[in-house]
Amino acid sequence: MNCEREQLRGNQEAAAAPDTMAQPYASAQFAPPQNGIPAEYTAPHPHPAPEYTGQTTVPEHTLNLYPPAQTHSEQSPADTSAQTVSGTATQTDDAAPTDGQPQTQPSENTENKSQPKRLHVSNIPFRFRDPDLRQMFGQFGKILDVEIIFNERGSKGFGFVTFENSADADRAREKLHGTVVEGRKIEVNNATARVMTNKKTVNPYTNGWKLNPVVGAVYSPEFYAGTVLLCQANQEGSSMYSAPSSLVYTSAMPGFPYPAATAAAAYRGAHLRGRGRTVYNTFRAAAPPPPIPAYGGVVYQDGFYGADIYGGYAAYRYAQPTPATAAAYSDSYGRVYAADPYHHALAPAPTYGVGAMNAFAPLTDAKTRSHADDVGLVLSSLQASIYRGGYNRFAPY
């Protein structure tokens, strides 16, 4: 019996040895303590006291079970270090542009403020000159240039002031804009560059007709060529100027392409319109049809006005004298007034050589010769007014 007890005791002592060895399948290992949770939490123990039941700490910190081959202590340092490194990297990347932006913006502002700036000053007193404008704006900063715009009559009431520093220019604009100087409210604005456009050259001849800017009348090409056909004012009851029955012009304006012609007095629907009008048409380049020997007072063909004169005529034609060789011209853009009310006050200007433009050769008695002298005076006055003051030099702009 004693032997059996000793044998059993030895078996019990031998069996106790495996308890000290590592078990192949350990119990569940919990994650390392986080956020102040005590380390004893990993050991199996009862739940916390009832007063902590309201706090849901377990869902916030989920517990992951790891097999015994892997221990959480081996991976957590690498994971946490990777997270911290990546977090610091993103912070530095985000902070880089914020650090660089304040450095570039002040440099740009300083460059803009150091550039010169030009101001446009309008509605300034007309007696102001450059020193006056410089004195007005000089209190705000250094001025590079002052310019007041003038024409032949004096100041135009506006000018330009160029500051060396744009900040000074802005301050001057804010202070002086809208201020009253000698009863005039001046305006100060930033000067802008003017867009230069090429002005179209206006042809003085509009379909062969030239506009006189002084008198405001319209003259035909025959007037410049010396071939002027005056209306029969005697038939209309006008006694201001009366043309002779036939006039011969022996000279024309040099360089003008239209030929001179032996002229007859022209009559063109004056009884219908209240004034005499000469008859031309440029749209008829070919020779006109043969004349109809009717209505002897009418000289040139024109379908439009022939309808007014003839009324029921089937073919709107009227007589044309055979010796007339002048080309046909149009008055569709204006009217010819043989007697302008301003011409009696205009004397012929000898410097323009208008006396050589028309030489009259009277063919009849002394009465016709006197008529020719009157007509020559009128023509000289008309032609002198054409070249007198073609442009107004007192235009404001």
Swiss-Prot record:
Mind telling me which InterPro entries this protein's record contains? Answer: Fox-1_C_dom, FOX1_RRM, Nucleotide-bd_a/b_plait_sf, RBD_domain_sf, RBFOX1-3, RBFOX1-like, RRM_dom
**One GO CC annotation:** trans-Golgi network
What subcellular compartments does it reside in? Nucleus; Cytoplasm
Superkingdom is Eukaryota
Region entry Disordered, spans: 1-121
Ordered alphabetically, the record's keywords are: Cytoplasm, Methylation, mRNA processing, mRNA splicing, Nucleus, RNA-binding
The annotated consequence of residue 126 to H/W reads: Reduces RNA-binding affinity 15-fold
Ranges of biased composition (kind: Polar residues): 70-87, 100-113
Domain named RRM is located at 117-193
Pfam families given for it? Answer: Fox-1_C, RRM_1
Any keyword RNA-binding? yes
> A GO term (biological process) for this protein?
RNA splicing
**Residues the record lists as Omega-N-methylarginine modifications:** 388
Q: Where is the composition biased (Low complexity)?
A: 88-99
Q: In which tissues is it expressed?
A: Predominantly expressed in muscle and brain.
Keyword Cytoplasm set for record = yes
Q: Which residues carry this modification: Asymmetric dimethylarginine?
A: 317
Question: Subunit structure of this entry?
Answer: Binds to the C-terminus of ATXN2.
Q: What does this protein do?
A: RNA-binding protein that regulates alternative splicing events by binding to 5'-UGCAUGU-3' elements. Regulates alternative splicing of tissue-specific exons and of differentially spliced exons during erythropoiesis.
Protein name (record): RNA binding protein fox-1 homolog 1
Taxonomy-wise, where does this protein's organism fall, top ranks first? Eukaryota, Metazoa, Chordata, Craniata, Vertebrata
- What gene does this protein come from? RBFOX1
